[in-house]
């Protein structure tokens, strides 16, 4: 049994089926595909790509049960499955608490963006906080959202230390997203995101330069602030 019908679950099912195992995928959504179908914007990868992979593994004999949420591995074992692979994805949002004002989670925004073809009411000025690939997708999607005029990518280190792939960042900049480095968000008030100016310090355990606060405060226009600071696996 494979729990989760996203890219990891589909890949696991493929390799297991190739070795002769009888595989069943359990997917809680209406269709398999995971983040590719429901979160990653169509300008990155279309549904046709994941549909092709799904069709391929089904022809190999993989069974896919949709609209089926699994809450107990023991129940699957009791049904006769010899092994269970959890491929549920990192869908638990990372959080960033501001002293004042509310933020929007990047995964929720991307899901809403895709479901509504970019027709969302998020104002003219959008700030995306984060430096990973999810932040890049979010910034590009925000730039394509109806009514948005300016998108600012706020990161507390410099470009050099961003975890996002270099080509991802280049695409973001080419599409007109404005990059604001060495800023740490503090509060959102009256259409302005107040940020502490940071400075690079000593290298930390991650191999990147650490950062420390300065006394300077920078304001960034913001009707909506979207947080993309790292997703986690929901082990609950």
Please give the residue ranges for each predicted region:
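Glycine-rich FAD pyrophosphate-binding loop
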Residues: 19-37, 151-160
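Short glycine-enriched, charge-decorated loop/helix-capping segments at active-site entrances
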Residues: 39-44
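Short amphipathic alpha-helical segments
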Residues: 13-15, 37-38, 96-100, 139-141, ...
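A Rossmann-like FAD-binding core segment of flavoenzymes
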Residues: 48-94, 108-122, 144-236
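Conserved Rossmann-like nucleotide-cofactor binding loop
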Residues: 8, 30-31, 91, 134, ...
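N-terminal Rossmann-like FAD-binding beta1-loop-alpha1 element of flavoenzymes
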Residues: 1-25, 134-143
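Residues that mark the start of a beta-strand
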Residues: 1, 22, 124-125, 150
